Amino acid sequence: MRWQGSSRRKATGGKVITARGKRKFEMGRESAETRISEIKRKKVPTMGGNRKVRLLQSNVANVTNPKDGKTVTAPIETVIDNTANKHYVRRNILTKGSVIRTSMGTARVTSRPGQDGVVNAVLIE
């Protein structure tokens, strides 16, 4: 689990004396690490009774051509580049900003698959 509360260190490097401990709502969750395979989603309860859809696996993306504004569902072939982590390329993990090869051409992922539950991408030259 990840802790998403404030740091115990000040900007100067000194320790902050906290008046309380950690709280459960400050805990994070493990990342979804969406892979290229048959579509698999998972619904996760969030604060306020809401839900978040995690995309665990996907083999299609909604690819938009910026020249004509048309959006087409295209199969994903592979991950070409990922600025989030260089090891995600060989593991074919999709994150926002990753460059993928589709049947329409090379595209950059614009959605957050682990939080949105869908892969949206824009064609790049």
Swiss-Prot record:
Claim: Ribosomal protein is one of the keywords in the record: yes
Record Pfam families: Ribosomal_S8e
Keyword Heme attributed: no
Highest taxon of the lineage: Archaea
Any one Gene Ontology molecular-function term assigned to this protein's record: structural constituent of ribosome
Example of a GO cellular component annotation carried by this entry: cytosolic small ribosomal subunit
Keyword entries, A-Z: Ribonucleoprotein, Ribosomal protein
One of the GO BP terms on file: maturation of SSU-rRNA from tricistronic rRNA transcript (SSU-rRNA, 5.8S rRNA, LSU-rRNA)
Matches recorded under CDD domains: Ribosomal_S8e
Quaternary organization: Part of the 30S ribosomal subunit.
Stated family: Belongs to the eukaryotic ribosomal protein eS8 family.
PANTHER family: 40S RIBOSOMAL PROTEIN S8
Listed name of the protein: Small ribosomal subunit protein eS8
Organism this protein belongs to: Methanosarcina acetivorans (strain ATCC 35395 / DSM 2834 / JCM 12185 / C2A)
